[in-house]
Amino acid sequence: MASQIPYIDLHTHRNYPVSALEVRSIKNVALNHSELVTEVDCSVGLHPWYINGNTEHDLGLMANALERKQVLAIGECGIDKTIEIPLTDQQSIFDKQVCLAQKYQKPLIIHCVRAFEEIVSSLKRLDFKEPVIFHGYRKNWILGQQLIRKGYYLSIGQHCLNGSQDELLQHISLCHLL
């Protein structure tokens, strides 16, 4: 009998494993949101919602954390045009995280709200070569297709159950969906 591939929860905030359900979880750790790297597989990132005056310190914590084998990715990181933090600050911090991901050869888990052009432009300008996952993708199939053609992946959540992403779900290949 062939072994089954476990479900991978790419982005969780749970502090406990769900092994009984054959789920492999990657915990999200926001270093600037009072969390520490744990002994479970995780990603670390400076989420745009929590950017503050300690950014350089937080980037140092991130660089140290990236030395640990449990840290599998950088994220959530990205740009959110609906928050009050200046776009230039968000862009600068995002770019620094992209550079760290490149240096440590880690995938990026992207938080993107109304900033697809800025994020894709940064990834191209910085010649980023590692995997890129657009977390919580809620846009249409046309944009999704453009991102997939660039080699990026999309992750979706429960919002896809309301019918707003039926076209995306009908067309996207499972190899591009996380």
Regions found by a protein language model. Name each.
Residues 1-178:
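Mid-domain alpha/beta scaffold segments of enzyme catalytic cores
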